[in-house]
Amino acid sequence: MPSLSSYDVGKKSFEGRRYSADVEAGNEAMQVFMDCIRTEQQRLRRRKKKIWKPRLIFTLGNHEHRIERAVENDAKLEGLMSSEDLNLRGWEVLPYLQPIIVDGIAYCHFFTSGVMGRAVTNAKLLLQKKHMSCVMGHVQDRDIAFDRNAAGNRMTALFAGIFYQHDEEYLNPQTNGSWSGLWVFNEVDNGTFDEMPVSMSYLRGKYGANS
C-alpha cells in the first residue's frame, strides 16, 4: 500500500501514488493466485477425483493496516476506503497482529516482543518469547531457530522471508539479494514439522514460461 505510506510523504518518489492503483494491483495478483487453485479444482472435477479444497488463511499485515490507520487519522475517509476493498473472498481473514494457531503452530504477520508492540527481531528470540512453534513474515530475510519445550517436544520459529521476483526501491543492493521463496511443511504434528524451503529460482525454472 505505497500510497498510504507515512514514511514517504513529501519525497519525490511519493508523487503519483494512488490508493485505487494499490488496491487494483493487489486484487489482480490475488485473482491470478486463485485462478491457479480453481483451475486445478476444475481439472479434478472433470476427472471425477476428490476436489482439492485448501484452507485459505490471510493474516493482515502492517501494509493492509495502513487503510484502517488512514481512516482513523482522517474521519472524512470513512466509507470511502476500508480493508473490504481487498478481494479476500474465500479466505479466513485475521486482523492485524492477531495470531492463529493451526496444528499447534502459531502464525501471524509478525509477533510482538513486548508491551510496546515492536516486532521480534530474530527467530531465536521468537522462541524465547512465545515458547511454541511460530511462523511470521514482515522482515526481508529468512531466519530459523530450534528448541525443545519441557516435555521434550520440538519447537521451530521461522521468519518466512520474501517472495519477490523484483528488487524493491526501499531496499539496498545487499538486502535486495535476500533469499526469496516459499515454505512447505511436512510431517506436521502438534507444533512439530519438517520445513522444506522452495526458492523462487527453483519455481521459475520448473514452472515458468521458459521451463
Segments predicted by a language model, with ranges:
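Feature recognizes metal-dependent phosphohydrolase scaffolds
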Residues: 2-12, 17, 31, 35, ...
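Core catalytic region of metal-dependent phosphoesterases/phosphodiesterases
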Residues: 1-88
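Conserved beta-sheet core of the metallophosphoesterase superfamily
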Residues: 108-200
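Short secondary-structure boundary segments
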Residues: 1-4, 85-99, 187, 191, ...
